[in-house]
Amino acid sequence: MERTRQRERESNNLFVFSDTISKEAHTSEVFESLLNYSNAETNKPWYHYHNMIDIFKRSHYETFWLEKQIIDQRGITQNLFSNRSKNLYYILGNYGAYDEELAKFYSKNVQSRLKSKNFIVFHLIGSHSWYADRFPKSFAKFKPNDLDFSNLHASSDRDKQIVTDYVNSLYYNDAVLNEIFNLFKDKDAIVFYLSDHAQDMFESGPTYGHRCSKAGLEIPFMIYVSDIFKEKHPEKVKLVKNALNKPFMSDDLIHSLLPLVGIHTKDEVESKNLFSPKFDAQRKRIVCWGSMDYDKIK
């Protein structure tokens, strides 16, 4: 929730990045380069590149993946990554419809299995449509009359209700993130959160949902650090603070996350490391299968 997020900002536990995008607008396409060394400029098939899960395992981390999305034929790509984890859990409808079940399942079934070093993925449903199904009724805080639609192509009552449901799903998502952050507040822990893609909510035209547009690519990206992590790793916290306003594309995540936690490989490129002084802030962010230069449409 915004109040919770504001408190975290004020206590310097939560760092919110201002200029992050995905290179595509669909989960499966984003996953082709989110957790491995493939990116928008590489030429080999994405599955030829080393992936983050295997690298963490080789670095003696216990790996966990908690999955809330139903995997169908459109989710084969992320399924291939999740299956690399040593411990894979599907927390689907039989556990409850909402993302809060991930935190509950973790507390009950995973926490006791942690080792000295752990890499844990929580894959939320988030704000995928249908948006009204993404939050409990108790989180239906906003009504259409509460929102400003003047900059949107939402003209009908139906369109405005869709936008309102989406806003409520974000309100609920903030609460879920707060629950996940709290799971690690007493650990030496750093938590990365980002969306695989965004939703274009009547922003570029009279439609909503997946769209390879400016609005459909702009994603939230934030990092939570526990007090213990801050105390033990002040130099890493400083690197995070210094990167908050740099232009970033999520296909470079592996080049940034691994070095920050002390893992280095022969495939890393320092100019792609968001937290390095040598980060290339002039990189052209070519998106949507090479069809668009994002920064030229800003």
Language model feature labels by segment:
Residues 65-67, 119-126, 167-170, 190-195, ...:
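Short beta-strand segments
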Residues 71, 182-186, 199-201, 209-212, ...:
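Membrane-interface soluble catalytic domains
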Residues 72-75, 125-179, 207-220:
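Active-site-proximal cap/lid insertion segments
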